[in-house]
């Protein structure tokens, strides 16, 4: 096992910044030592959004964005090192997810595209970098997502208690950790993504703090029913999705043809959509005793309250209560996946992704011991 100190870097679909964590990893033991949040420049965020939503682009624009994100991720790692005083030579490796700009897990040429040049990260930090985690799973017929359930299984499973772990980022994904059963996991649908886009459009706020705006509105049942009729929600697992599907254009199509709905009621209804689509999947799997929630959505008080109401037999709690920061869960997972790759251990779960077999994940971008610069 390649035990040591690892750095995980995550920039998710919410585009609310770059999360960086430092952790000591030794087998099943993952001890978080520090975290750092690096801002996402507004222009870069807008460029990513444009690409994610299928706007016309060029190879030059894709290449530039790949380079810019690689530099941003490298600078984020340097920010963590500066904050902690840890030297680069004390880090075994960086695990970097990259920035997803397109995820197309079905069809003859299934693929997932994460930008953020790992060569630049390695060069800027002088630390071996592991990245491009999703495409190996897809090469074996998998969805390439979600990958975090393997980490959830390693750290949060229980021998007798029925647990599920829910990450609410831009997209919500669920890991089912049920005793005696293979781990299952999939994207339930929108997490914060539509809520964030809507409040930005109408309130110029990046997110609905504590769910406060949504609390002032009412659920519009015709809109909720229209959205719930989307075929994605009835697809069987394995399944995964992203901003290329659930985006502002999708929401506009749902609103078209309905009587006018006030902006605040749309926000309330989007919150209810996230809660209902999550809880329906929990119930379809036979329920659980604890639903452990992480990600930015865990801070949305209305969303948490609605899930508790929809799951009366389940304790809805935070992963923080079990020793894992909900804000840092995904970055920690990719530090752990880098550890798995360098240790020669598989990182995917075929029962989750639908791949034909377990496999090593990612590419390794090594550096010379003394820097080579």
Curated annotation (Swiss-Prot):
<feature type="binding site">
    <location>
        <begin position="12"/>
        <end position="19"/>
    </location>
    <ligand>
        <name>ATP</name>
    </ligand>
</feature>
<dbReference type="GO" id="GO:0005524">
    <property type="term" value="F:ATP binding"/>
</dbReference>
<keyword id="KW-0547">Nucleotide-binding</keyword>
<dbReference type="GO" id="GO:0016773">
    <property type="term" value="F:phosphotransferase activity, alcohol group as acceptor"/>
</dbReference>
<keyword id="KW-0808">Transferase</keyword>
<dbReference type="Pfam" id="PF03702">
    <property type="entry name" value="AnmK"/>
</dbReference>
<comment type="similarity">
    <text>Belongs to the anhydro-N-acetylmuramic acid kinase family.</text>
</comment>
<comment type="function">
    <text>Catalyzes the specific phosphorylation of 1,6-anhydro-N-acetylmuramic acid (anhMurNAc) with the simultaneous cleavage of the 1,6-anhydro ring, generating MurNAc-6-P. Is required for the utilization of anhMurNAc either imported from the medium or derived from its own cell wall murein, and thus plays a role in cell wall recycling.</text>
</comment>
<dbReference type="GO" id="GO:0016301">
    <property type="term" value="F:kinase activity"/>
</dbReference>
<keyword id="KW-0067">ATP-binding</keyword>
<dbReference type="GO" id="GO:0009254">
    <property type="term" value="P:peptidoglycan turnover"/>
</dbReference>
<dbReference type="GO" id="GO:0006040">
    <property type="term" value="P:amino sugar metabolic process"/>
</dbReference>
<comment type="pathway">
    <text>Amino-sugar metabolism; 1,6-anhydro-N-acetylmuramate degradation.</text>
</comment>
<dbReference type="InterPro" id="IPR005338">
    <property type="entry name" value="Anhydro_N_Ac-Mur_kinase"/>
</dbReference>
<protein>
    <recommendedName>
        <fullName>Anhydro-N-acetylmuramic acid kinase</fullName>
        <ecNumber>2.7.1.170</ecNumber>
    </recommendedName>
</protein>
<keyword id="KW-0119">Carbohydrate metabolism</keyword>
<comment type="pathway">
    <text>Cell wall biogenesis; peptidoglycan recycling.</text>
</comment>
<dbReference type="GO" id="GO:0097175">
    <property type="term" value="P:1,6-anhydro-N-acetyl-beta-muramic acid catabolic process"/>
</dbReference>
<dbReference type="InterPro" id="IPR043129">
    <property type="entry name" value="ATPase_NBD"/>
</dbReference>
<keyword id="KW-0418">Kinase</keyword>
